[in-house]
C-alpha cells in the first residue's frame, strides 16, 4: 500500500476512535433468537430485526433444506445467464400476487435494490427528492447519480411541496415506509397525493414495514392505501432471511432487467434461499398471530416505560430509547449488558448529532416476562427504579 493511502487509513481510524464512534463486529451465537450468547454468557436480545420471529423458525429451516435438496447450493450465475431458476420465478410471482405488482426484480440486499433503481433510472436534468433521514444506500446513490438531489426535513410535507412546486423537470420522490432508527412512519397518503399533484414518481423503501404493518403484512404502503411506482421490500427483517426485491409495473421491470447493474452483474440469490423466501411469504400472509403478538408487546412496552423521558412512541417494533450524548449512550448500553440485556448504542453518523440512542427492537418471539425484565433493567440503569 502506498504511504498516502496508509496515512489516510490510520488518520481516519484515529479520528473515529477519538470521537468515540469506533464500531466493531462481535462474534455472537444465536443472534437471530431472543436469547443470544457472547463469550460464554447469555443475554436477552433486543437488537435484532427479526420482527416476526421467522429467522430461526423450524418450518422455514425445513423449507431451506428442501430447497437445497431440489436446487443445490449456489445459483452459479447471474439472473440473465443461467442463475434464474423456478425458485426465483415462483418467489417473484408470490411477491407480485401478495403486494399487487406486475414485476418483482430480485437483489442480494436492500442496499443493492435501492441503488440499482436510482443509478439506472436517473439522468442529468432529473430531480431526486429525499427525506433527510433516508437510508445511507439511498443518500449515497443520490449523491453519486447525475440527477440534482434535494433533501427535505424529515416527514415535512410543506418542505416537500415547496421543492416540487419549484421544479418542472422529471422528479422522483424517495422515502422510507418505516424509518429504521426512529421507528416512525412516513405520511405516505399525503406524500402520494403531492406526487400525483406535481406529476412526480414515488419510491418507497419499506424494509421495516413489510411483514409487520397492514393486512396480511403488506406493509406501510398498503396500510396507507398507497401504491408507489417503485416499492422496495427486503428479506432480512420480517422475512427472517436476506435479500430484497424491487416491485414495479412490467415495463419498469423489463427496464431493470436490462439496465440495473446490481441485478445484471451479480450472481443470483441461491435458489434454495429463494425457495425458502416463497415459504416465508406464505407464513407472513397467513400467520396473523405474529403481528398480533407484536402489538401486544408494543402495548406492554408503552405501559412499562411510557412515562420515561427517553421513551419514544411508535406504532412499529422499533423503539428508540433517546439519550443524546454519544458516550452516555455507550455507557447505558454497557450497563444494560452487565444486567443481561443486549442493546446496541446507535451513534453518529448513523443518527444525527446529539441524538444517540439505544435501538430497541421487539420480536414476536419475545415473552411478556422478557419485556418486564427489559423494562426493569432500563429503569434501573437510568436511575428511575
UniProtKB/Swiss-Prot annotation:
**Which residues of this UniProt protein bind substrate?**
23, 135, 350
MF annotations from Gene Ontology: 8-amino-7-oxononanoate synthase activity; pyridoxal phosphate binding
Q: Name one Pfam family in it.
A: Aminotran_1_2
Q: Would I find Thylakoid among this entry's keywords?
A: no
The record's catalysed reaction(s) read:
6-carboxyhexanoyl-[ACP] + L-alanine + H(+) = (8S)-8-amino-7-oxononanoate + holo-[ACP] + CO2
> Which amino acids does the record list as binding pyridoxal 5'-phosphate?
110-111, 180, 208, 234
Give the enzyme's EC designation.
2.3.1.47
Q: Which cofactor does it need?
A: pyridoxal 5'-phosphate
Q: In which pathway does it act?
A: Cofactor biosynthesis; biotin biosynthesis
What this protein is reported to do is described as: Catalyzes the decarboxylative condensation of pimeloyl-[acyl-carrier protein] and L-alanine to produce 8-amino-7-oxononanoate (AON), [acyl-carrier protein], and carbon dioxide.
Assembly state and interactors? Homodimer.
Q: Which family does it belong to?
A: Belongs to the class-II pyridoxal-phosphate-dependent aminotransferase family. BioF subfamily.
Quote the protein name from its UniProt record. 8-amino-7-oxononanoate synthase
